[in-house]
Structure formats: C-alpha cells, structure tokens
C-alpha cells in the first residue's frame, strides 16, 4: 500500500520510508508495517503516517492480526514535512495511529518486533503491542536519543544499548516480552506466536489433543499457601492445571540479579 508515496525523479523517499501491506504467514492472513531504515533512518513522515493509519483500519475491517516491524528514529522533523504551525503527529494524523492501537487492543492481536532503534514518539508503537520481541545488540527503545540526553541534561550515556537497549526493557521496564539473539530467531518466534493465537477476539484459539497435566491436578491447594501475603512458586499450580502441549511459558529474558 502506498508504494509510490513520495516518489520523485531522484527517488529520495521511496514509499516514504515505510512498507505496509497484507500477506500470509503459514497460511494466516496478517496486516503489517515495516520501517525502511535506508530512507531517512526509518523516520515517520506525513505519507508514512497516513499509510500506517490506512493499514490499521484495514486490519480492523478484516479482523486480522497486526504485525509491526520497527526500525525507526521517530517522527521526521524536516521543515518541509509540514505547513507552518502544523504537525503530522497531531490527534488526527500521528495521534490517530496510537488511538487505533488502543482500539485494536482486545480485538486483534498486535505483535511487535524491534529490528533496530525506536526513538521519540515512535517508541509508543511497540509499547501498545500485545507481544513485543527485542533482538540482542540491535534493538533499542527510548523517548530521547543519547545525543538529546547529553544536550538537555549534560549526562553522557554510551549509546542506545545503555539508554534503552533490550536488556533494560527485559529486566527493568518490563516492556519486552522476550529477548532473542538474532533477526531470524525473532521471525521464527512470530510464526510460533501466530500459530497459537486466534485471528481476533471472536475466534476460538487453536486446539490440540488434550493430555494430562505433568503434576497431580487434584492438589493445587497443596502448593498455594493459605496466607495471601506469602510468596510461592507460580509454576507449581500451573503444572497441575495445564497440560504440557499448552503454549510455552515466556522464560525470563534476562536472569534475575542475585
């Protein structure tokens, strides 16, 4: 959608730096957006924002999952991007993207993959996703870049990984659901997630043949303490209620500190 947006003779802004469309992954229809970092560092321009809004509306019409492949430095701030006093991130354009993500919530699944940096207003996109994958060493998500932090506060940070890298979001902010070693593994995880979830809120999730739980299902009360303030291992009751073929648990992306 919008392949020829911002097309020019010198082809400065092909597709306005954003690909959108509808395709299939293992037979499942999915709507997607993908930033093109080779065009203005994946920044969001006027036409790019319009393309996002259109594909979001199409996903809602079709009731299909929304896949966000993010590699962006945020909103494009060039003077030529707007009229005097106007902005493409207001409530009817850029703000509409986030409104649509709120409307999607609970209706169609939203899966995000950070294949690179995600800075400023664009950093809200993955936060709204239901399931967020970050990739070791290349993902990053911050409201302000290291350069802006240095300019505004005088504080030096070594780079995106220190300021908003995957380790920070997996261990401290809790924004990342899983941290994976490379882009190929991230793509495989997207396929696995799609296999295990329904297309939308009105469909039942995929089913598999039932099997007994790995532990005695008759005794969950034996592993849950009577005192509501006492901590316990949550895996113990789960093992007594859920059979092994159920969706895998989300392992801790980063081991907890000692």
Where are the predicted features?
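Non-catalytic terminal/interface segments that mediate subunit docking, oligomerization
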Residues: 2-31, 60, 226-258
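A structural preference for short, pocket-lining loop segments at secondary-structure junctions
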Residues: 23-36, 51-81, 258
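Glycine-rich anion/phosphate-binding loops
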Residues: 12-16, 40-57
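Gly-rich Lys/Arg/Thr-decorated short loops/hinges at beta-loop-alpha junctions or inter-strand turns
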Residues: 1, 30-39, 77-80, 150, ...
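Conserved catalytic cores of soluble enzyme domains
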Residues: 70-202
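Short alpha-helical segments and helix-capping/turn motifs at coil-helix boundaries
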Residues: 7, 16-18, 51-55, 97, ...
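Flexible beta-alpha connector loops of hexameric P-loop NTPases
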Residues: 38-47, 80-88
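Terminal amphipathic helices with adjacent charged low-complexity linkers/tails
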Residues: 178-235
């Amino acid at each position: 959608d919008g392949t020829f947006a911002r097309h020019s003779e010198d082809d400065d802004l092909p597709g306005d730096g954003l690909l959108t469309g509808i395709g299939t992954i293992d037979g499942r229809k999915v709507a997607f957006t993908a930033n093109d970092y080779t065009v203005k560092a994946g920044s969001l321009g006027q036409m790019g924002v319009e393309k996002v809004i259109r594909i979001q509306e199409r996903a809602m019409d079709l009731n299909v999952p929304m896949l966000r492949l993010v590699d962006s430095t945020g909103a494009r701030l060039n003077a030529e991007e707007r009229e005097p006093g106007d902005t493409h991130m207001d409530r009817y354009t850029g703000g509409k993207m986030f409104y649509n993500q709120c409307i999607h919530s609970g209706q169609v699944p939203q899966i995000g993959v950070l294949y690179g940096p995600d800075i400023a207003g664009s950093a809200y996109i993955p936060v709204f996703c239901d399931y967020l994958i970050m990739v070791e060493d290349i993902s990053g998500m911050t409201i302000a870049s290291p350069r802006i932090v240095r300019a505004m506060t005088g504080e030096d940070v070594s780079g995106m990984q220190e300021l908003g890298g995957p380790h920070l979001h997996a261990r401290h902010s809790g924004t990342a659901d899983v941290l994976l070693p490379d882009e190929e593994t991230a793509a495989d995880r997207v396929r696995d997630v799609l296999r295990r979830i329904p297309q939308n809120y009105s469909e039942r999730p995929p089913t598999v043949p039932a099997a007994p739980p790995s532990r005695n299902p008759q005794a969950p009360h034996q592993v849950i303490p009577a005192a509501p303030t006492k901590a316990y291992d949550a895996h113990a009751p789960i093992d007594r209620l859920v059979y092994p073929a159920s969706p895998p648990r989300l392992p801790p992306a980063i081991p907890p500190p000692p």
